[in-house]
């Protein structure tokens, strides 16, 4: 049968799947909508977006992620709490049970790519038991043309079976849920969780392994956009720090909102879609993202919906704080269609400072940039991980520690080399609290963060004056159009300056304690950047 046929009975034998019922092969969005409704997987909201629930897991199950410890990757992977080793034999036994589970079931396949640059893109095959997860893959990855589908040979396959539960005592997992990456077999297994973010972040993990190791390409947890003069900018930051929001600017074209590579030619997006946090999404401050929540093809994950009127409530967090919208990049009006741009002129490192002591924006030296990149200070923002209810200070290296398969200094050295070669200006932006810590101060307005970033990107801040923060050694601008000058130095916003000094000193100590593990791998200038 040809690839333009919607269903077939065979085609997955190379993955050991020999007895499935119907296989929906790269079905279009409309077919997936039909199946989602028919199978009771979701509801169509009043403006056409699809509302789904993920059940028990409403965020990443970080403790359930493993990498198979096998010869091809043993020496390269940074084993530890993030990259937990999994026994190859246990993997094979678990996979056999998953194959048996798929017998007689309908399956959905999306043949697609990760990586907008054709020279570096990774051919993928995403196999799911639920139609809405297939739509998620169709939204998030780069779609293959009909001609490419005829010749598609996946380098990696991902099998997602939320209805299949592991047995910890037999399988060596921690719970019924599991996300297991096998770099040698080029296979990812996901079970026991319906949270769609596991699909995209598993693919991101393998890109974070393959690209630096095989091609010396820097893989980054970042968003990126391009200005009217062709100047591109990179926004680093963990989930919930503002990457998606602040890079979706009507005056700049969006390259992508979450994952990118940086090679000798410039930047390229890994994905073909966005996965935006939408809790309490405001149409006035985030009009482009808000508009996507009212579009056919968008998936609204864990968003409250009135089952009678089919109207959604983006302010309702009764199910989770981590409500999400998955949509193709084409839902955003101002994008870079190719997903490719030149070398960045500016790098923005976003942090959600729960202590409220970092300035809203500061200019970094190259040494400070590498220090803060390796530190990855931010807060675990409520809802993005299972069990996290409110912001908690944390250090997540490379602003994406849970997804970095290699030693962080591999990514840090690649970043240092590229910043130096291309003379990139680097900025640290606090989208967290001002006037006090979480619970006392106020969250910095999106409009202020956007004004500060725009002033950094257009050169206004660089042309102005700066003062040096005595605790972190950061260069703080003394003024910025559209932002109250008194808030630029955070000490001025605290009612008790002595308490600010004490809190800032404690955070400096936390930075230095965390950085000791990187000191053997970096220069003295970087080690002493704070």
Curated annotation (Swiss-Prot):
InterPro entries: PEP_carboxykinase_ATP, PEP_carboxykinase_C, PEP_carboxykinase_N. SUPFAM superfamilies: PEP carboxykinase N-terminal domain, PEP carboxykinase-like. Its main location: cytoplasm. GO terms for molecular function: ATP binding; metal ion binding; phosphoenolpyruvate carboxykinase (ATP) activity. GO terms for biological process: gluconeogenesis. Substrate binds at residues 60, 195, 201, 324. It is found in: Cytoplasm. It catalyses: oxaloacetate + ATP = phosphoenolpyruvate + ADP + CO2. The keyword Metal-binding applies. ATP binds at residues 201, 221, 237-245, 286, 324, 443-444, 449. Binds 1 Mn(2+) ion per subunit. Its cofactor is Mn(2+). Mn(2+) binds at residues 201, 221, 258. Keywords: ATP-binding, Cytoplasm, Decarboxylase, Gluconeogenesis, Lyase, Manganese, Metal-binding, Nucleotide-binding. Its EC number is 4.1.1.49. The keyword Chloroplast does not apply. Pathway: Carbohydrate biosynthesis; gluconeogenesis. GO terms for cellular component: cytosol. Belongs to the phosphoenolpyruvate carboxykinase (ATP) family. Involved in the gluconeogenesis. Catalyzes the conversion of oxaloacetate (OAA) to phosphoenolpyruvate (PEP) through direct phosphoryl transfer between the nucleoside triphosphate and OAA. This is Phosphoenolpyruvate carboxykinase (ATP). The lineage of its organism: Bacteria, Pseudomonadati, Thermodesulfobacteriota, Desulfuromonadia, Desulfuromonadales.
């Amino acid at each position: 049968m040809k690839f333009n046929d919607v269903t077939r009975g065979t085609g997955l034998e190379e993955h050991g799947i020999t007895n499935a019922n119907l296989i929906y092969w790269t079905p279009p969005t409309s077919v997936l909508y039909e199946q989602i409704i028919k199978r009771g997987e979701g509801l169509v909201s009043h403006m056409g977006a699809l509302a789904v629930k993920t059940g028990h897991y409403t965020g990443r199950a970080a403790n359930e992620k493993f990498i198979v410890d096998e010869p091809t990757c043993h020496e390269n992977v940074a084993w530890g709490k993030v990259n937990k080793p999994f026994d190859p034999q246990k993997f094979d036994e678990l996979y056999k049970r998953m194959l048996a589970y798929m017998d007689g079931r309908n399956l959905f396949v999306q043949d697609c790519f990760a990586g907008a640059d054709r020279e570096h893109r990774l051919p993928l095959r995403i196999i799911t038991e639920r139609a809405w997860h297939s739509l998620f893959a169709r939204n998030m990855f780069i779609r293959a043309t009909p001609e490419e589908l005829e010749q598609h040979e996946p380098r990696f396959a991902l099998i997602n079976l939320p209805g299949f539960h592991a047995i910890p005592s037999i399988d060596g997992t921690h719970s019924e849920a599991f996300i297991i990456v096998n770099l040698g077999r080029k296979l990812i297994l996901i079970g026991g969780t319906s949270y769609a973010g596991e699909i995209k972040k598993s693919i991101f993990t393998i890109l974070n392994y393959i690209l630096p190791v095989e091609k010396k390409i820097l893989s980054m947890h970042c968003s990126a956009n391009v200005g009217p003069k062709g100047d591109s900018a990179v926004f680093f930051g963990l989930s919930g720090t503002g990457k998606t929001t602040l890079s979706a600017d009507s005056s700049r074209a969006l390259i992508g909102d979450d994952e990118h590579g940086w090679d000798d030619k410039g930047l390229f997006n890994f994905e073909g879609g966005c996965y935006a946090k939408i809790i309490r999404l405001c149409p006035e401050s985030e009009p482009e993202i808000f508009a996507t929540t009212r579009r056919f093809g968008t998936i609204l994950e864990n968003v409250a919906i009135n089952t009678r009127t089919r109207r959604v409530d983006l302010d309702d967090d009764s199910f989770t704080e981590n409500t999400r919208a998955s949509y193709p990049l084409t839902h955003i009006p101002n994008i870079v269609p190719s997903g490719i741009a030149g070398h960045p002129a500016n790098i923005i490192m976003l942090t959600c400072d729960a202590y409220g002591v970092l300035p809203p924006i500061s200019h970094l030296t190259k040494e400070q940039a590498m220090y803060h990149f390796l530190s990855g200070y931010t807060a675990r923002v409520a809802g993005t991980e299972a069990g996290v209810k409110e912001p908690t200070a944390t250090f997540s290296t490379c602003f994406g520690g849970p997804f970095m398969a290699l030693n962080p200094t591999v990514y840090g050295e690649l970043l240092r080399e590229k910043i130096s070669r291309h003379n990139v200006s680097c900025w640290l932006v606090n989208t967290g609290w001002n006037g006090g810590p979480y619970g006392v101060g106020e969250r910095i307005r999106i409009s202020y963060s956007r004004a500060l970033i725009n002033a950094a990107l257009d050169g206004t801040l660089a042309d102005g004056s700066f003062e040096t923060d005595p605790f972190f050694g950061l260069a703080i601008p003394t003024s910025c159009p559209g932002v109250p000058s008194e808030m630029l130095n955070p000490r001025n916003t605290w009612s008790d300056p002595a308490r600010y000094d004490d809190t800032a000193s404690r955070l400096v100590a936390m930075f230095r304690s965390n950085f000791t593990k990187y000191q053997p791998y970096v220069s003295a200038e970087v080690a002493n950047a704070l």
